[in-house]
Every structure is written in C-alpha cells, then in structure tokens.
Amino acid sequence: MKAAPVPQPLLTFGQCLKQLLTKRKLSASALSRMMEQKSRNSIFRVLDDTSGPAAQTAFYESLIASDCLSLTQEEKDALSRSLEVSRVGAAGYRSNQAMHRLLGDVDIKPQSDVPFRVDRSSDGSRTTFEEAMQRMARENRSVRFVMTGCCYRSIFKTIAEAFTPEQSCKISILHYMYTGGDDIIRFVSAIQPVFYSPDYEGYCIRENEFNNEREQIYRANTMIVHCVRINGEKVSYLVSLIDPRRMLLIDPCNENYVALLEKMMHEDQPRMHRMKAAIALDYIHGDYLAYTEAFRKLERGRAIYDIKLDVPISYIHPDLLLSSVRKGFSEQEFGEGAEREELIGKFYDIHLRRYENFMTKRRATHTIFSREAMMEFAKTGVQSDHFFAMAPYEKQERVQILAHLRDQHCQNPYFNLYFFKPEYHPPRTEICLYEGKGTMLTKADTDFNLNGSHTETLVSQSEFCQKFKEFFVKDLLDSKVLSAEETTAVFDELIEAAKSSEA
C-alpha cells in the first residue's frame, strides 16, 4: 500500500512569494523593477508580512495584472490561498476551509489510492478499513461503535457507505471528541456523513475539563467495536489509529478493560456537552403543527445568520401561501374536509407570527441565497425544500414574494439579504445560527417529509456557534457575496423572470 502524502505547511503571502522568487532565481528588487513600482520598500514589507492584508491583496492584484512572472494557474492559486492564510492565520484558514466543506463548497480530494490500512494483531494479516467495515456490515446483526477522536471525514464516510439500510445491520455510534480551539469546525465537517443519523450520539470535551491523564484518553484516536453476529455470538474489537492512514485492530480485545473504559466515559458524560439536539418529529399531521411551532419559538426575537438556497417559507406572508396550501393539501389528502380547513387555519396563525417576527423584530436577520436556486424558484414556483403537501406558487404569487423581499432588502435595516457570488458553488448544506440557542444544519433539496429524506440537527455547542458566526461575517459577507446594489439588481432580474415565466 502507498504511504499517505505528507501534508504541506500553510504559507503566508510573503513566504509564498519568496518561494516563487527563489524558484525563478529573482531578487525582490528585480521583481519591483519588473512591476514598475515607485518604491522598493513596499515589496520588502510584503515579503516580511508586515504590510497588512489590504496592501498584500493590492500587490497580488498588481502582480497578476502585470503578468511579469507568467504565473501558472497552480501558482496563482497558491498565492491566493496564502493571502487568506495571512488574513486569518493558519488556524483560521483551516477552520474556514472546514466550514466550506460543511457547506459543500470545497470537496475533499479523493484518496482512494491511499486507503486506510488495518493490521490485525491476531494473525498479522492486513486489509483496508473499507473492506473491514463492509465485512462487518455483512456478517453482523448489529454493530456498536464507541469512539474517541477519529475525526477524519474518510473514516465516517466509509462507515456510512458500508452500513446502508440494504445491509440490514443495525449500527450505533457513541463518539467522544476533545474540541479545543478551532477543532470543533473540522470535527463537525468530518462527522457530517453520519451526523444527521439518530444513531449517532456525540459528546464534546472542552479544554482543561479533565486532568492531563484523563484528557489523553479522549485525545486518542480509538474505536471500541461491539459486534453481534447473525447467529447471536458477541465479539468486541479495539482499534487504534497509529499513523495518519494506518490502524491497528486488536482482536480479541480485553473485555474487562473495555468495560471499565466505557464505564468511566459514561460517568464523565455530565461534564461533557452533547453535540446535537434534533427537533424533527414523527410524521402525523399534528406533529407538523408542533414542528412548525418549534421553529417559531426558535426564531422569535433572535439575531439570525442563515445560508439558504432560496426563499424560506417564513419570509412569505401566509396570504400568499393559502392557494398553494389548499391545492396541495387536497391533492396529497393531507387532512379531510373540515379537519383540513381547521389544520390550515392553525398553520396560518403560526406562520403569520413567524412572518411578523422576521419583518418587525429589532435584531438582525442575515440570509445568503443561491442565485441559481432563486432563479429556479422564480421560474417554477418550487422551492428547493418545497413542502411535499404544497402545490407550486402561481406566477403572480412569485412576483409578489420576490418584490416584497426586494423592498425589505432596500428598506428594512434589520432584514439583510445577499446572494453568493457566481464563482461560489451553491451550498449542499443549509446552515442557520439562531444566536443564543444553536446552529441548525439541514440537508438541502428535500421535500420536508419528516418520514422521508428531510433531516436537520441543532448544534448547541457554543464554540461551534461562535466560529460559524465569525465565518459568516468575516469570510462570507466579507468576500463571498454580491454588493447591496448588485443584490438589488438580481432581485429585479428574478422579478422579471417570474413575470415572463410560462408556469
């Protein structure tokens, strides 16, 4: 098996530029002359990383415009990346990249040619983690993981892909994570493949919560794996990650040691912080009312930082929902006769209160949309997360919805709308911070069927919420969204698209 690639250090802009000059055997003075700079002092400040982000950005743009070094695309990308490292630091850069991965903007590079190697202690045989998980899923009735650390996306992706519903092997994951510094963002991104599952339970351990010896246990990358064979036989394994892509599987493991370790972890749980809290309810009509009411309470009076593909239903006056709701409820047989009208009336009351909260509260709402998804809504009347029991919005309703959002964007200082820049990939995860309560992660492009593919989870871990807000304000709003004037122009374009649509 191939060795895992050695990660390259993150360079500041000055360091990256020095590297390029060394590669081309150029001096700083020579580059300054090639760029026709009036003062050579500025380039030395850039190289020493003492000139500040704005000056470095201006220098980078001037360098690209002059094309005096004939930079390759790879070199341009490296310089662009180093600008971000200089702006937010190496830890902040990693944190932002993890958040982009969470949104689905930055894909993890495939590492299929460097598989996780698993060495078995019993016979010295070798396999891959992927093969080991697939075999476990085939040969067992149930598998229970108790994990510390192991926060690598490839590990959880492999587990999620092996234990599919088709395998009929019940799985559960109890996960303990040490979450100091910026680790929390990377960890949530890493566990995303299993994060929404009700069978995943995560606990965060804050810095200095335990003594050094106890802390080392939670910092270790280990798995205790309890298997129940199809014939009822029980067996347990202990797995340790001993290299970046190499695991040691101890079989059979010492059952007494494992039992004592799990008992200790269970007793420590009150001093930990639960990673998530789900609010989804079982699918019956009454539960949808409770579900909607839960969101109303979550939104009420809070500052909100939201990443959505297109317009949320809570931004639409319920008068504009009635036609779509009545038609859809009838087609889907969502309630009957008088019961249906009573249900619609209750939904109307809750949504009116939600709508009025967003339009009148004196705490800011910030929402970033995907232009592509909003254009699809303008043309078809179908939201990316359109409720399965609602019909599409009619043309005139769409025009009114979009015109109202445009007016709020221009006139309401507490209601701030944005669009991602064209070069930013549309997110595949919707994330919303309800300040003071938690951050909601929602799978995009579902039909809100709580008995189907729709799922969300509320992360109440305070460090994650703080880091997401910093990312939203200092990264997304600073460099990834259109200006206010450009946003208004996009709304004008959307309104015209709705007016001229055939549907």
Identify the meaning behind each predicted range.
Residues 1-28, 33:
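A short, Lys/Arg-rich alpha-helix, primarily the initiator
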Residues 1-10, 55-115:
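Short amphipathic recognition helices of helix-turn-helix/homeodomain-type DNA-binding modules
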Residues 21, 46-47, 59:
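DNA major-groove recognition helix of helix-turn-helix
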Residues 32-34, 58, 142-147:
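Short coil/turn segments at secondary-structure boundaries
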Residues 36-55, 81-82:
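Recognition helix of helix-turn-helix/homeodomain-like DNA-binding domains
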Residues 120-481, 489:
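Hydrophobic protein-protein interaction segments
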Residues 481-503:
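Long, C-terminal catalytic modules of enzymes
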